Amino acid sequence: MSEREERRFVEIPRESVRLMAESTGLELSDEVAALLAEDVCYRLREATQNSSQFMKHTKRRKLTVEDFNRALRWSSVEAVCGYGSQEALPLRPAREGDLYFPEDREVSLVELALATNIPKGCAETAVRVHVSYLDGKGNLAPQGSVPSAVSSLTDDLLKYYQQVTRAVLGDDPQLMKVALQDLQTNSKIAALLPYFVYVVSGVKSVSHDLEQLHRLLQVARSLIRNPHLCLGPYVRSLVGSVLYCVLEPLAASINPLNDHWTLRDGAALLLSHIFWTHGDLVSGLYQQILLSLQKVLTDPVRPLCSHYGAVVGLHALGWKAVERVLYPHLPTYWTNLQAVLDDYSVSNAQVKADGHKVYGAILVAVERLLKMKAQAAEPNRGGLGGRGYRPAEDLPWDSLLLQESPPGGSSETGFGSGLPPPSGVAGPEDPSSLTLADIYRELYSFFGDSLATRFGTGQPAPTAPRPPGDKKEPAAAPDSVRKMPQLTASAVVSPQGDESPCGGTLATATAASESRPLPRVHRARGAPRQQGPGAGTRDVFQKSRFAPRGAPHFRFIIAGRQAGRRCRGRLFQTAFPAPYGPSPASRYVQKLPMIGRTGRPARRWALSDYSLYLPL
């Protein structure tokens, strides 16, 4: 058993060690040769084990000479040269005994230099792209290199840096404005670029001060807009600082009086501007940023302010980002948001207010998605195919949020601009292709009448009759197709405090106002209805019969319930008071058409104050 354990590894005999020593002119005893043979076996096993680790790390099954040389260098041993050839070395036996050695052929350098045949290269010709940027000193910096920490600045640049930082972080707004304008146009501050980027990266240390965060974002905006600066390796740091202001739950957001929403809007717009103007430098960040926004949006532990930042960030990156990230996760996210909005407890008031912010941001994003999808479906619609037409992806659409105007009058992309991914940018895979009607029907089930964009969701228009031989398809269920809600107007003219809708008071009021009651037209049930220019609508006030006391005043109140398939809905009521100013009575002589259908006939009497209640 002991002999088997001793023979688990291949051992070099002491005779081989003695022969190697004699070839160099040394004589060894048996004890020394045995000790050297044992040590040589251990060193070879160690080098072989390390070289096999290098082979496994490169996912290969063949051990090469380079792996063995790496193992020798790892053990601080000089590498063995001359064995890296792909061809096997010829071995020759010695005459004296069973000893083999590699054959070393003599090579004539003169014949090799004067040879006419040129050896072919071992590898195929390949082209490798290497991008270099100019650093602050005018030298070429290789791609991905980190600038050195120690750099020498002139006294003028150092004074400029100190004055600008004091002006930006100081208390004088006019001086800060001048400093930011100079940062945006100065062409001699390339050496100070890493220092200003380091200042902008300090947003993580001042998350409790919104004013300082706004100023640092303005510094980043000025650096990005400077046409004389090449951001190069610093653009990743700037994008990270901007994303911190967009997504992170800042310490200043704890106080509800702090307007951190504007900070997130401005940071999202700045992120869109970076991708629009420096797409070649951030080509590898588009996918990572979309994944970061998606991760924050789908995390229920994150606060609602972070969800708001994720939504406005997707909106700033364009409607395609909204379609690929926000729209697929909307059904899952809507359940949690609806639970927050339906909680009417006093302790949930602030969280509910934040939920309404997120609700509004999602509404603005999906409305832009609907508009851009509609324009993509109808490219030849009027106004889009004429003179000066540009694709939908290139149009700098306006937004309801913060907008910026670039220097020099150049157009700049705002929120929801349909910004396409920059050249060379690979975005996430497109979701399942859905038609505009399917997307609108799905969004209408969430938002109801809050959507400003309107498309038909009811039954399709009747088509031509089918031949008798065709099989009639079953009609869709009433619940499966959601129709647009219909406004119902109840035209009830309310009397004033001293008047009553009864007969006597009505006659007195009529006589006082010197106006005749409206004649009633009795028509037989089978008589045909008169067709005119206003066919299909009914007028509330068919004639101008106002009292001489002055022009009447109208108060419109629209109320209803925002309902959907996934929620009970919320009641809402909005009043639209008319301006009380001097206006001629002829302004109200025009006919007001009814909205929808009337539930009952209107009762009329002469008044100077009318009320129109429109429940949904």
From Swiss-Prot:
* Keyword terms: Methylation, Nucleus, Phosphoprotein, Transcription, Transcription regulation
Biological process terms from the Gene Ontology for this record are:
positive regulation of DNA-templated transcription; regulation of DNA repair; regulation of DNA-templated transcription; regulation of RNA splicing; regulation of somatic stem cell population maintenance; transcription initiation at RNA polymerase II promoter
SMART domains referenced in this protein's UniProt entry, alphabetically: TAF
Sites bearing Phosphoserine, chain numbering: S494, S500
Name this protein carries in UniProt: TAF6-like RNA polymerase II p300/CBP-associated factor-associated factor 65 kDa subunit 6L
Q: Which residues carry this modification: Asymmetric dimethylarginine?
A: R549, R555, R587
Q: What organism is the protein native to?
A: Mus musculus (Mouse)
Query: Which function does this protein serve?
Result: Functions as a component of the PCAF complex. The PCAF complex is capable of efficiently acetylating histones in a nucleosomal context. The PCAF complex could be considered as the human version of the yeast SAGA complex. With TAF5L, acts as an epigenetic regulator essential for somatic reprogramming. Regulates target genes through H3K9ac deposition and MYC recruitment which trigger MYC regulatory network to orchestrate gene expression programs to control embryonic stem cell state. Functions with MYC to activate target gene expression through RNA polymerase II pause release.
Q: Say which domain of life the source belongs to.
A: Eukaryota
